[in-house]
Amino acid sequence: MLPNANSRPRRLALADDNTVYYADYSRGFLGRLDLANGQVKEWASPSGPQSQPYGIAFAKGAIWYNESFAKPSTLVRFDPKSESFQTWPFPGGGDIVRNMDVTAGGNVVTANSLVNQVGFVEIR
């Protein structure tokens, strides 16, 4: 059970340290569930409570997700070690990124459903 009854996680990302990250669409939060002890920690998404985070992935030691209601749609990187965020306008507008996955090389691929695109984020 998540600590806030209003949480509505859309997608999950498994990290390499036995934790699960979730994009809380309804509240505009990024959350982490530690599978070893059940503890949950949450961070407000950079664009605020109406940002509607959706697609999410773990790649090269960081969490990547999309704020679907930010205008323009925003690509977010979260560093779990420093607990800090970086943001960029989503290339091509992005709109709602419903799913993200990671290539064998550790880059992020996105499904941008409302703009008929598949995106590629090269992580350097």
What are these regions (language model features)?
Residues D34-G38, D79-E83, E122-R124:
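Short loop/turn segments that connect beta-strands within beta-propeller blades
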Residues F29-R32, S73-V76, Q117-F120:
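A short loop-to-beta-strand structural motif that recurs across blades of beta-propeller domains
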Residues L14, D24, D34, A57-F58, ...:
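Residue-level signal for WD-repeat beta-propeller blades
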Residues P3-N18, G48-N66, G93-G105:
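Beta-rich, blade/repeat-based domains predominating
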Residues M1-L2, Q39-S45, S84-F90:
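A short beta-strand motif characteristic of beta-propeller blades
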Residues V20-S26, I63-A70, T110-L114:
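Conserved beta-strand positions in repeat-built beta-propeller and related beta-rich domains
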Residues P91-R124:
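Blade-level signature of beta-propeller repeat domains, shared across WD40, Kelch, NHL, RCC1
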Residues A5, S26, A36, P49, ...:
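A generic "binding-loop/recognition-motif" signal
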